[in-house]
Regions:
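Short secondary-structure transition/capping segments
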Residues: 61-63, 89-100, 130-143, 221, ...
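A short acidic, often aromatic-flanked loop/helix-cap motif at beta-alpha or helix-coil junctions
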Residues: 115-118, 243, 263-265
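N-terminal short leaders/motifs
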Residues: 42, 56-79, 171-214
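Phosphate-binding site recognition
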Residues: 121
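Metal-dependent phosphoesterase/phosphodiesterase active-site architecture
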Residues: 255-256, 262-272
Length: 272
């Protein structure tokens, strides 16, 4: 097949765990500036997947909205205006942003695990909290943010109290240590080994409905980038937009994890 006959599929970009704060410090301001540049790159892709914890704290109260993310939100406005589809998977820090993201960017309301058929693959999307890394504080916070009772309790709290709780938990948001990384990869390998081999690609109209039929699973949350292959499937974890500034690109069925500071800018000039 010649290059002229090869039909390229729109590229898909993935990013997770930037943990942007309402009150950023100078180091975060640089990460924000680079995120704005990433959004400019995403304007040339077919899809941009925000895989959770983009915002370190988000809660919509009935009478006011917390401010501090305007630069990030405006950068995403540019992505949507360029025709790139934005997908949002809420993390344990920003699950409550789902409704707002739907209203502003047209993102579908996705369950904790969902499928996206794009980039030449069947992709299972999941933030990843609760999968591999046992942490009682995260477990408690996850229960709070994802349960109806927890949301009701949160709405009864003064915003400053909820913000203080989130700030305390965000202090635990860092890159995984070497020892933690080994544990995470070991548990991830065990999880993947327990998944059956994927079936053949079926009716395109039904694809995306069966959560067992995926070729590539992409998660965030663990703040450690890796890829594991088993039984015809790949499990990939994004390192987070921390240090390094990690993101992923899926193009024509090929998955790549990249460092925005160090790796060459990928060619995403594919037809939509």
């Amino acid at each position: 097949m010649t290059a002229m006959n090869h039909i390229q599929r729109p590229a898909v970009m993935f990013v997770a765990d930037s943990h942007f704060h309402l009150r950023p410090d100078p180091a975060e301001m640089r990460r924000r500036e680079r995120f704005v540049e990433l959004c400019r790159l995403a304007q040339r892709a077919g899809h941009l997947v925000l895989l959770g914890d983009i915002f370190d704290f988000w809660f919509d109260y009935p009478h006011f909205r917390l401010r501090g993310y305007e630069e990030v939100l405006q950068a995403l406005d540019g992505v949507r205006a360029a025709g790139t589809a934005i997908h949002f998977v809420g993390g344990n820090h920003d699950i409550w942003a789902a409704d707002y993201m739907h209203e502003r960017y047209g993102c579908g309301i996705r369950p904790p695990r969902s499928l996206l058929v794009a980039g030449g693959s069947r992709v299972m999307l999941c933030h990843g909290d609760g999968m591999f890394k046992l942490d009682w504080a995260y477990g408690a916070f996850r229960t709070l943010v994802r349960a109806r009772a927890g949301i009701a309790v949160a709405k009864s709290l003064h915003p400053e109290i909820l913000f203080t709780l989130s700030t305390w938990l965000s202090g635990r948001s860092r890159c995984a240590t070497r020892d933690e990384a080994r544990v995470i990869e070991s548990r991830a390998a065990s999880w993947l080994a327990g998944q059956p081999a994927p079936g053949p690609v079926g009716n395109p109209n039904l694809m995306g409905r069966d959560l067992t039929e995926w070729d590539l699973a992409i998660i965030g949350h663990v703040h450690h980038g890796f890829s594991i292959h088993e039984n015809g499937r790949t499990l990939a974890a994004l390192p987070g937009w921390l240090d390094p500034l990690g993101y992923g690109v899926l193009q024509d069925g090929q998955w790549r994890q990249l460092d925005f500071d160090r790796d060459p800018t990928p060619d995403l000039a594919t037809p939509r």
